[in-house]
């Protein structure tokens, strides 16, 4: 393997061993690529990946809940499969009947690996990334796969910037998702990102701290559940702790915890099993 191969391998697996299915998993899930035509992005086709759980093909009348997963920046959708190994977690937990199966959907939230969109609706009408996820991707997945096409069967999660995106999208669309997870996400949009331009009003409209009190009555009524964590030395720890306090003040069900460490892939890998179980336990099943 040459230098380029080593670099590609590291970027794909982040220094961890490649995923390997346990021997007892006789019917692993399948990974599919989906192109979504997105009105929210000016009609462009945007890539997403879908992981269908073990047994999906063998149970043609069964419907499945969906967990939408948003990558960080810089990032790519397949990091959830290659690095976090959520596909193997899905197969392992469902094969041993420790958790119900989920369809995993991983959209690509940018126009390139190093272009930053924060999973939010920007100034340009061709840069409405929150609507891309909550409308275009959700509609495409519901149309093509045997999902539970309601909020009761949908969760949204993300790591790092994707964690911010998951919470921000859920607050903008409080009737679309019943479970919201943030893995080391932040709670304040970055004012230096070009997506929002110089519009302070747009920044405020994408600030979860300001959004939460406005939509809290809807979240309480629907029982939307927030599950999120931060590393003990993560620079976003205080933001997350404050957000947990506000959720408690608003009477919204949630679980927030801190794990030892910083803002690392090791934390996200080690917490992925618990994240999957938290979603699978609360999402409706067909």
Where are these regions (language model features)?
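Non-catalytic cap/lid and distal C-terminal segments of serine-dependent acyl enzymes
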Residues: 1-286
């Amino acid at each position: 393997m040459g230098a380029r191969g080593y670099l590609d391998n590291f970027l794909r697996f982040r220094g961890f061993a490649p995923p390997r299915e346990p021997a007892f998993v006789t019917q692993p899930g399948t990974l599919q690529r989906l192109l979504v035509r997105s009105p929210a992005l000016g009609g462009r086709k945007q890539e997403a990946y879908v992981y269908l759980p073990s047994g999906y093909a063998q149970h043609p009348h069964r419907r499945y809940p969906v967990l939408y997963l948003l990558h960080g920046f810089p990032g790519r959708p397949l990091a959830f499969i290659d690095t976090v190994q959520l596909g193997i977690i899905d197969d392992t937990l469902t094969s041993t009947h420790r958790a119900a199966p989920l369809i995993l959907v991983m959209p690509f939230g940018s126009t390139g690996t190093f272009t930053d969109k924060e999973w939010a609706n920007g100034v340009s009408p061709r840069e409405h990334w929150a609507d891309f996820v909550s409308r275009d991707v959700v509609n495409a997945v519901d149309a093509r796969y045997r999902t539970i096409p309601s909020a009761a069967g949908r969760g949204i999660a993300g790591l790092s910037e994707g964690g911010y995106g998951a919470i921000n999208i859920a607050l903008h669309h409080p009737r679309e998702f019943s479970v919201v997870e943030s893995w080391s996400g932040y709670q304040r949009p970055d004012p230096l990102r070009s997506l929002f331009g110089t519009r302070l009003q747009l920044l405020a409209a994408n600030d979860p701290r300001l959004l939460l009190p406005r939509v809290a009555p809807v979240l309480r009524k629907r029982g939307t559940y927030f599950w999120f964590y931060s590393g003990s030395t993560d620079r976003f720890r205080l933001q997350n702790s404050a957000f947990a306090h506000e959720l408690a003040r608003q009477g919204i069900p949630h679980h927030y915890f801190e794990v030892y460490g910083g803002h690392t892939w090791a934390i996200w890998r080690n917490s992925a099993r618990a994240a999957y179980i938290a979603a699978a336990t609360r999402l409706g099943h067909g």
